[in-house]
Swiss-Prot record:
It is found in: Secreted. It comes from the Eukaryota. Cecropins have lytic and antibacterial activity against several Gram-positive and Gram-negative bacteria. Keywords: Antibiotic, Antimicrobial, Immunity, Innate immunity, Secreted, Signal. This is Cecropin-C type 2. It comes from Aedes albopictus. One of its GO terms (biological process) is innate immune response. Pfam families: Cecropin. The gene is CECC2.
């Protein structure tokens, strides 16, 4: 094999190894977004019956 082919193989191996280490930061961001979504869902779950009750009183 010539040098160019070896260089490409080594570069691809390095990119694969470095690319997998980035998942830690993305995982943390995903967890934060998931937590925010859960809080919004829980707040909406608590508020919707109150809103529905207020609409029923207005009729």
């Amino acid at each position: 094999m010539n040098f160019a082919k070896v260089f490409v193989l080594v570069a691809m191996a390095v990119l694969l190894l470095v690319g997998q280490s980035e998942a830690g930061g993305l995982k943390k961001l995903g967890k934060k977004l998931e937590g925010a979504g859960k809080r919004v869902f829980n707040a909406a779950e608590k508020a919707l019956p109150v809103v529905a009750g207020a609409k029923a009183l207005g009729k």
